[in-house]
Amino acid sequence: TDPFGSHTRRLSRRFVDQWLQHEPDARIIYRDVGQNPPPPVTGRWIHAAFTPETQREPWMREVLRTSDELVDELLAADIIVAGVPMYNFGPPAQFKAWIDNIVRVGRTFGFDRSREGTPYWPMLADTNKRVVVLSSRGDYGYDGGQMAGWNHVEPAVFTALRYLGITDAHSLAVEYDEFGDERLQQSLREAEAGVDRLAETLAAARHGM
């Protein structure tokens, strides 16, 4: 339970509940990066990540320990459901730290200077993973309205995951959060209905329906 009434936690919880109705045997991994943020990427982290695994010193493995856990969770997942509120037009720093920790050379993207063409390539392109971003926004009109072009939440998340090869991306958002009036309640109702439909659609797609 969130004491501050997080809309994104409410939507992500609803999606999981709906998913379990369609996929009762699904294994759920829950990670709250808002309450327990991953460590930020540092120079030591980058040095450790770009050092071949067989050459890493003990301190390097320790620096990458949380990143390895997050990458393992990502690799094990069929679907990633992320509650990502909008903070100043972009994702929270805690969620950006999660992104930085899963974009890992040799694990989620490849790099080879001798490779013809681009030296980078996605390592998750054939994994059939899906991502669902459930967001909340204080203002309104981000989808084709007066704030169109100001939303950097979904673009930031989807760009990073597309770089890794995850291209099946979906999103829903609550707006009018700062107004707290009937428009917010209507937006919540629409988002919840959208969550229900999306969970049903994605579950059906898993079974070729």
Residue map of PLM features:
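Short, structured loop/turn "capping" segments at alpha-beta junctions
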Residues: 105-110, 167
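Short secondary-structure boundary/capping segments
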Residues: 20, 72, 121-124, 162
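Glycine-rich phosphate/pyrophosphate-binding loop and the adjoining helix
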Residues: 143-209
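N-terminal beta1-alpha1-beta2 submodule of the flavodoxin-like/Rossmannoid cofactor-binding fold
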Residues: 1-107, 193-209
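Short histidine/acidic/glycine/proline-rich micro-motifs that form metal-
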Residues: 1-3, 140, 178
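Short, glycine-/small-residue-rich phosphate/pyrophosphate-handling segment
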Residues: 111-160
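Structural beta-sheet core signal
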Residues: 82, 131-135, 171
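Residues at the starts of beta-strands that form the adenosine-phosphate
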Residues: 25-27, 129-130, 168
